[in-house]
Every structure is written in structure tokens, then in C-alpha cells.
Amino acid sequence: MATLTEDDVLEQLDAQDNLFSFMKTAHTILLQGIRQFLPSLFVDNDEEIVEYAVKPLLAQSGPLDDIDVALRLIYALGKMDKWLYADITHFSQFWHYLNEQDETPGFADDMTWDFISNVNSITRNAMLYDALKAMKFADFSVWSEARFSGMVKTALTLAVTTTLKELTP
């Protein structure tokens, strides 16, 4: 499995022109980051253990291929902070929600605002979050949906890259 560089992540996310494709790509990237992190959980990397126990667990059809199961394991073993666990879970849940919708909301919709208002890696960045809030609740003459959508996309991209940096073993 190839390791994604920050440039790869930025390129892939920037190429997405709507919220659905953005969240699908973000979900795939976060799952790949978790897959790359998982082997570091196993202390004894004896060849036999890796071959007969670790590899089957991490295989694409294995039990740890599910992002929610893998996250719970990482968190339960104390290898992930609560805020990070919450952010990745939140991304996963929002992606699953969008996947079930007939019409996907846009970057500037209230549903998306509710989502980003609960992403710790965005809300903990006071300058970014305050700028988003100011634009979201600004007088209409100042507010531009295209500008706000671009800013939301940037904030979500920063959240994904911040999360991936935390998943470095």
C-alpha cells in the first residue's frame, strides 16, 4: 500500500467539486491512513505472527477493514486521543449519511455547517473557525456562497490532513 503524501491528499481533495465526492475521497483517504497506522498496534512483529495473525486481520476482507471497527480498536488500546477518534468517527458518519441521501447538500448548506461545527480539528483552530463563523453569519451583501463554499472545503481539507498527521505511527 503506497503512503499518501500531504501533496497527494491536497490534490485529491482539491479535485473534488462537490460535497459528496469530497467526503467520499476524504473517507477513502482516512481509511487508508488508519490501515497504515494499524500495524504499529502490534508489538511483536515476529514473522510468523505477522503472516498468520496480523495480515489476516488487516486484509481487505478482514475484520479491521471496517473503519469503525478499526477505530474502536485503536481507541480502546489507548493509541488515539478522544478528539481524534471523535473526528474520524464524525467524518465516517457524515459520509455514510451523505451516501444514503437522494440529494446531497452543498458545502454552504446548514447540514454541512452543523458537521464542521462538530469537527474538533476545525473548531480547535480558532482563527479558521472564527473566520468561517463570521462569513457564515455575515450580512448577505458581504457573504458569497462560492467564497464560503471554498472556505468550507479548505477547512475540511485541513481537518483531513491534520487527522492524517495524527495517525502517523
From Swiss-Prot:
Reactions it catalyzes: (S)-malate = fumarate + H2O
A Pfam family: MtlR
Matching SUPFAM superfamilies: MtlR-like
Function text: In vitro catalyzes the addition of water to fumarate, forming malate. Cannot catalyze the reverse reaction. Cannot use the cis-isomer maleate as substrate.
Entry keyword set: Lyase
Family to which the UniProt record says this protein belongs: Belongs to the MtlR/FumE family.
Protein name: Fumarase E
Top EC group: lyase
Keyword Lyase among record annotations: yes
